[in-house]
């Protein structure tokens, strides 16, 4: 495992203490962490999935639009945040590893460190209310 930048270490540490689901990726888009609140929505624990490449996580949860059409990875907010290096937001559906479909809202940001170092991206997301 390569050494992580201090900003990434601190982001992960913060995520561990927040009630908001958070998903963190490195500059290549590889998953490096998601917190316990995210586990409930994704339907699996981080300790069971571990890190995974963007090509895997971007399709593993079967993201679809409101019409049920598969969303390509390049349309996902976190992929936009790391490839275009600007914030992105979207509402879409995923299938958790527990088999349940969930409508989620995602806001993703690029992680930019001191001296403009690109460190990856972070997504905050939540399940939309069905009320």
Regions picked out by a protein language model, each given a short descriptive name:
Residues 35-39:
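N-terminal capping loop/helix in small sensory signaling domains highlighted by a polar->aromatic N-x2-3-F motif
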Residues 109-111:
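Output-coupling edge of small sensory domains
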Residues 75, 89-93, 100-106, 122:
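PAS/PAC sensory module
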Residues 2-27:
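Sensory modules in modular signal-transduction proteins
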Residues 70-74, 81-90:
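PAS/PAS-like sensory domains
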Residues 117-128:
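PAS-family sensory domains
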Residues 47-68:
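PAS-family sensory/regulatory domains
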Residues 31-32:
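Conserved hydrophobic beta-strand signature of PAS-family and PAS-like sensory domains
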């Amino acid at each position: 495992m390569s050494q992580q930048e201090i900003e990434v270490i601190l982001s992960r540490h913060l995520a561990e203490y927040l009630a908001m689901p958070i998903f963190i990726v490195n500059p290549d888009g590889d998953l490096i962490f998601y917190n316990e609140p995210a586990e409930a929505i994704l339907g699996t624990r981080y300790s069971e999935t571990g890190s995974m490449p963007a090509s895997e996580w971007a399709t593993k949860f079967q993201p679809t639009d409101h019409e049920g059409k598969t969303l390509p990875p390049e349309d996902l907010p976190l992929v936009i945040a790391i490839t275009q290096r600007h914030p992105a937001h979207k509402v879409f559906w995923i299938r958790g590893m527990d088999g349940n479909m969930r409508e989620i809202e995602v806001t993703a940001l690029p992680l930019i460190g001191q001296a403009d170092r690109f460190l990856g991206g972070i997504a905050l997301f939540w399940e939309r209310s069905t009320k």
